[in-house]
């Protein structure tokens, strides 16, 4: 089994553009991840369809043609096959190298390259080529940028809307640590149709799961966006299986509602590799269903809760439900 210990010796400085994954990625976080002997056996209710189809290949080719990244691939999402096969994708902008080292995440860490000024237009053209109706735009954390990448988000949305005027756009943003006000001011100039930022886990587990992030900061980000753009639904999500209790999940859901968050996603954490945080429990589908019921009682406009639910899974259906309830 895996365990968590105090971090030890730090490795050499990483060159810009070099992507660290696995053990190298988590080497400098406040806690040390001891690799598991093997990945845990998944229960019967977790079954993922192998992502092989003409639609999957076509979308991958389009991404490569326009030099784009999908979080579906970078984060090893279990729904990649279903979403790609239905002709939808979540795009990851600002490169594929993150400035954070979250040990649950499979996206690479390092010193990112400079932003690609052509990315907004390339992204817009790719989305137009694929004739998508609902798109989620997310990004790596870019702590190296003065605005955390908020202007690049706005530029992407603006270019996409030029070529696809009827499209619905959801943004899944980082926490804009240390630059919330400037980031939100920029975001308000070109707001998305849904503003999403994931809390990921309960406050007690932040040090081990989200080093460099702060639970209260993330809640405030969602609330302050809603204050600036009250007509846009806000959304957040949690991964279950990192060591949280059911009671802690309910408490976080209540805090979300106190901060006027409209939509909720709850999914099972799946350990990407032996060098990531270990799965502490596999939450039964009945428990996910119970969380969904409790969430609706609390006043969420839409709750997507299930073992394979991810932040952008069926995001179009969730947004439609939130706007018509």
Curated annotation (Swiss-Prot):
Pathway: Protein modification; protein lipoylation via endogenous pathway; protein N(6)-(lipoyl)lysine from octanoyl-[acyl-carrier-protein]: step 2/2. Its cofactor is [4Fe-4S] cluster. Gene3D superfamilies: Aldolase class I. SMART domains: Elp3 (SM00729). One of its GO terms (cellular component) is cytoplasm. Binds 2 [4Fe-4S] clusters per subunit. One cluster is coordinated with 3 cysteines and an exchangeable S-adenosyl-L-methionine. One of its GO terms (molecular function) is metal ion binding. Residues 84-301 form the Radical SAM core domain. Its EC number is 2.8.1.8. It is found in: Cytoplasm. Keywords: 4Fe-4S, Cytoplasm, Iron, Iron-sulfur, Metal-binding, S-adenosyl-L-methionine, Transferase. Pfam families: LIAS_N, Radical_SAM. Belongs to the radical SAM superfamily. Lipoyl synthase family. This is Lipoyl synthase. It comes from Stutzerimonas stutzeri (strain A1501). The lineage of its organism: Bacteria, Pseudomonadati, Pseudomonadota, Gammaproteobacteria, Pseudomonadales.
């Amino acid at each position: 089994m895996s365990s968590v210990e105090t971090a030890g010796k730090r490795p050499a400085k990483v060159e810009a553009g070099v992507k660290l994954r696995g053990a190298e990625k988590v080497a400098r976080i406040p806690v040390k991840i001891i690799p598991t002997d093997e990945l845990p056996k998944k229960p019967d209710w977790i079954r993922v369809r192998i992502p092989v189809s003409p639609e999957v290949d076509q979308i991958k080719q389009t991404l490569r043609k326009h030099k784009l990244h999908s979080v579906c691939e970078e984060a090893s999402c279990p729904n990649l096959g279903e979403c790609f096969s239905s002709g939808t994708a979540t795009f990851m902008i600002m490169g594929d190298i993150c400035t954070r080292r979250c040990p649950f995440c499979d996206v690479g860490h390092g010193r990112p390259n400079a932003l690609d000024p052509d990315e907004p237009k390339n992204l817009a053209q790719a989305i137009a080529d694929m004739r998508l109706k609902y798109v989620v735009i997310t990004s790596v954390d870019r702590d190296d940028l003065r605005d955390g990448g908020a202007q690049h988000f706005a530029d992407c949305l603006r270019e996409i809307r030029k070529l696809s005027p009827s499209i619905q756009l959801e943004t899944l943003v980082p926490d804009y640590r240390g630059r919330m006000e400037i980031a939100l001011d920029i975001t308000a100039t070109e707001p998305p149709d849904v503003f999403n930022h994931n809390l990921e886990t309960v406050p007690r587990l932040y040090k081990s799961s989200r080093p460099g992030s702060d639970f209260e900061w993330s809640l405030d980000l969602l609330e302050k966006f809603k204050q600036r753009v009250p007509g846009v639904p806000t959304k957040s999500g949690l991964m279950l299986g990192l060591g949280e209790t059911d009671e802690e999940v309910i408490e976080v859901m209540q805090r979300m509602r106190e901060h006027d968050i409209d939509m909720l996603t709850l999914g099972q954490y799946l350990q990407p590799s032996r060098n990531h945080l270990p799965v502490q429990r596999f939450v039964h589908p009945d428990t996910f269903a119970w969380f969904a019921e409790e969430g609706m009682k609390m006043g969420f406009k839409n709750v997507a809760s299930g073992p394979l639910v991810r932040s952008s899974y069926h995001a179009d259906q969730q947004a439609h439900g939130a706007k018509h309830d």
